[in-house]
């Protein structure tokens, strides 16, 4: 039925628009023309209320493992630079991707320490602690599975605070252990804190290639509590001083961008306060402050937290903290995207090529949906067979729309045809297509993943636009093979140009997604022929040549 064919086109266009609109809404705020230096009233739960200090000047030390290259400031022990050697900045480049950065153009830091009444990071107690370290460079040696970087500070009262970074081979999770030795006569009250701060405006050199047409990924903050497993918090919301202030046992706070994330995970049994803050000068923050801990005189207290700094590898993130893997943002169809990704990853474990894995999963998905596809084509064929009767009825009844509607429904009932029978299978298939889109866009495994020939990065658009053109050709063949009774010249022109419109639209889509649609269209052609043969035997389809 032609109305159902038109519905298919409208649905595809609507879904495409939804994809574009979703990424538009999650896109990071546009740079402002002028930074404001105006002082504002601090919202409850912000950094100032929490006693979280600003960064200071100190000596820089470097820490290198097989997967991390960090720079830590001895003033406060903040991580100010983070390079990821396993992930090049660009395809074919020897320059590693930089996640954390401290430059005049851009700030992105992972801060941590001890605040609270007696904490050395409390601004009321003076400047942030200047830690002593044994050396300026630490390297995880070959055959070494763990690297510890201890930093010590002794206050004026003789109390010793030790902050130790613990790195493990192949791990993007860094434990930060605190030891508080109370040599005084009064209890010390301290609280661990972890804070991520970042410039709202994204300079050109930080562009990860995720801002192409229709491909805007979420960049901002997020947090998790036992009650709210995963909640995003936009940078512009923080910049508007609409700040987060929640208490939670467990959970985490994070900053996200396409493929990569940083997160602080408090490791304690008490209550933590999660907050966001507008720090001014175009910088926003999200962090946590733990419940105060008392260290009695002559005793040593121990506390810990974990910093994730690296790619969004789902299984590794899930092992670090509950729901941390949800930072791989698959949108509202995550419950479909996640199983699809697990299936794709399982296929890749045998095939070894993500492109061929996409081809295989396309066959699997289309195979599962074949009964729906068959039901759709069968319903459309039955509707086509009724067209002569419907046309005769319209001519007989003239402009009497009410009688036309009544007799048409009676005809459907007599012929046992559901006029919406071709729509329901289509509606069911659309979420799967959308889920595949989100999966292919959000999975780090496909970043810089080669396929074959000229396709060296499945997460990027085809540099020569060959795949989008092939996709358009397959759409053209499907259209030519599909029977139609369209007589309106305008509708004919619209249908004729549909493959061209979709080809142009897909020029900027990642090649992995376009590859999926090409294979899906080829499967459609095969399934179409099989279904039509069965319909011919039932007298519901004829091989008449389509009118152009």
From Swiss-Prot:
Listed GO MF terms: membrane insertase activity
GO BP terms, alphabetized: protein insertion into membrane; protein transport
Alphabetical list of Pfam families matching this protein: 60KD_IMP, YidC_periplas
Membrane-protein topology: Multi-pass membrane protein
Cited Gene3D superfamilies: 2.70.98.90
Protein family: Belongs to the OXA1/ALB3/YidC family. Type 1 subfamily.
Function per UniProt: Required for the insertion and/or proper folding and/or complex formation of integral membrane proteins into the membrane. Involved in integration of membrane proteins that insert both dependently and independently of the Sec translocase complex, as well as at least some lipoproteins. Aids folding of multispanning membrane proteins.
Protein name: Membrane protein insertase YidC
Source organism of this protein record: Salmonella typhi
């Amino acid at each position: 039925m032609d109305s159902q064919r038109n519905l298919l086109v409208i649905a595809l266009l609507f879904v495409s628009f939804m994809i574009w609109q979703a990424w538009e809404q999650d896109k990071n705020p546009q740079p402002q023309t002028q930074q404001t230096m105006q002082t504002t009233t601090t919202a409850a739960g912000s950094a100032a209320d929490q006693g979280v200090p600003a960064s200071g000047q100190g000596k820089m030390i470097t820490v290198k493992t097989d997967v991390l290259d960090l720079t830590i400031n001895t003033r406060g022990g903040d991580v100010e630079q983070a390079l990821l050697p396993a992930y090049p900045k660009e395809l074919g480049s020897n320059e590693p991707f930089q996640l954390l950065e401290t430059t005049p153009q851009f700030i992105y830091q992972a801060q941590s320490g001890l605040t609270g009444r007696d904490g050395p990071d409390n601004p009321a107690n003076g400047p942030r602690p200047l830690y002593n370290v044994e050396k300026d460079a630490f390297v995880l040696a070959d055959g070494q599975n763990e690297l510890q970087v201890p930093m010590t500070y002794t206050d004026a009262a003789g109390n010793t605070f030790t902050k130790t970074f613990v790195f493990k081979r192949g791990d993007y999770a860094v434990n930060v252990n605190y030891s508080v030795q109370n040599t005084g006569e009064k209890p010390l009250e301290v609280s661990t804190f972890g804070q991520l701060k970042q410039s709202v405006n994204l300079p050109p050199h930080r562009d990860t290639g995720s801002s192409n047409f229709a491909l805007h990924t979420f960049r901002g903050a997020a947090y998790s509590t036992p009650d709210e497993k995963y909640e995003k918090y936009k940078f512009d919301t923080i910049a508007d001083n609409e700040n987060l202030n929640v208490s939670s046992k467990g959970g985490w706070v994070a900053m996200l961008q396409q493929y990569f994330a940083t997160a602080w995970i408090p490791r304690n049994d008490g209550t933590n306060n999660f907050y966001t803050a507008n720090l001014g000068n175009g910088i926003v923050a999200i962090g946590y402050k733990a419940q105060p801990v008392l260290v009695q005189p002559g005793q040593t207290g121990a506390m810990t937290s974990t910093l994730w700094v690296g790619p969004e590898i789902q299984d590794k993130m899930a092992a670090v903290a509950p729901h941390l893997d949800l930072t791989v943002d698959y949108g509202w169809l995550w419950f479909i995207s996640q199983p699809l990704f697990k299936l794709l990853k399982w296929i890749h474990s045998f095939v070894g090529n993500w492109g061929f894995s996409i081809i295989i999963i396309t066959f699997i998905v289309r195979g599962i949906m074949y009964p729906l596809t068959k039901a759709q084509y069968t319903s459309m064929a039955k509707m086509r067979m009724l067209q002569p009767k419907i046309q005769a009825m319209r001519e007989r009844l003239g402009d009497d729309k009410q009688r036309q509607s009544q007799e048409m429904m009676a005809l459907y009932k007599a012929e046992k045809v559901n006029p919406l029978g071709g729509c329901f299978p289509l509606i069911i298939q659309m979420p799967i297509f959308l889920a595949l889109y989100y999966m292919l866009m959000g999975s780090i495994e496909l970043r810089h993943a080669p396929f074959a020939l000229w396709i060296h990065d499945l997460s990027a658009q085809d540099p020569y636009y060959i795949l989008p053109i092939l996709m358009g050709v397959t759409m053209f063949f499907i259209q030519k093979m599909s029977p139609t009774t369209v007589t309106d010249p305008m509708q004919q022109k619209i249908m004729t140009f549909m493959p061209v419109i979709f080809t142009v639209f897909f020029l900027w889509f990642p090649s992995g997604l376009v590859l999926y649609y090409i294979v899906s269209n080829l499967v459609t052609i095969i399934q179409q022929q099989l279904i039509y043969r069965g319909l011919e035997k039932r007298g519901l389809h004829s091989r008449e040549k389509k009118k152009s």
